[in-house]
């Protein structure tokens, strides 16, 4: 057998491969040559776009929206401040109304000399304090005088000052604290002249002026 040249089989193989596998078009050949974009590059591009152009548009929109919403927010704040101020004024008005009503009711039970005397708020409170103190001292004197042979009738100046120490207030007359003592109503029924004389000596307009209670 004669040796065949080395180039012949290679030509046949290449022709057979060309027949079995048709040649791809130029477009199909060029597509695979271009490498697919890596995910890291796409992420990097998106990040750069967000840093650059993607963030520019929202900033402009925010600036426009912020400029338009400023008057609305200021208007809402002013309305809210007005409503709060109105509520605070209403609360203060109601508080003063209740206080004035209570002071008027207190003035109605306090004896005044003359009757048409108009007391201020602080004068009403001081007069009520001193008047309650005088009544308490009178009841204490009447209660202690029931068991004495000769009931003393001390002068009102010896009773002490209404603005004394808190210990003086603790020693005042109390129907519950003193066992066996008669109630003020029983004292008045048994000895009606005793309390009247003591009370008139301490609270009569002739002995004490109205300014002494203020």
From Swiss-Prot:
Pfam families: HLH. Residues 1-14 have a biased composition (Polar residues). One of its GO terms (biological process) is sensory organ development. Residues 83-135 form the bHLH domain. Residues 15-26 have a biased composition (Basic and acidic residues). The keyword Acyltransferase does not apply. One of its GO terms (molecular function) is chromatin DNA binding. It is found in: Nucleus. Coiled coil: none annotated. Residues 57-70, 79-88 have a biased composition (Basic residues). PROSITE patterns: BHLH. SMART domains: HLH. One of its GO terms (cellular component) is chromatin. InterPro entries: bHLH_dom, bHLH_transcription_factors, HLH_DNA-bd_sf, Ngn3_bHLH. The keyword Transcription regulation applies. Keywords: Activator, Developmental protein, Differentiation, Disease variant, DNA-binding, Neurogenesis, Nucleus, Transcription, Transcription regulation. Residues 1-98 are annotated as: Disordered. Acts as a transcriptional regulator. Together with NKX2-2, initiates transcriptional activation of NEUROD1. Involved in neurogenesis. Also required for the specification of a common precursor of the 4 pancreatic endocrine cell types. It is linked to Diarrhea 4, malabsorptive, congenital: A disease characterized by severe, life-threatening watery diarrhea associated with generalized malabsorption and a paucity of enteroendocrine cells. Efficient DNA binding requires dimerization with another bHLH protein. Interacts with ATOH8. This is Neurogenin-3. It comes from Homo sapiens.
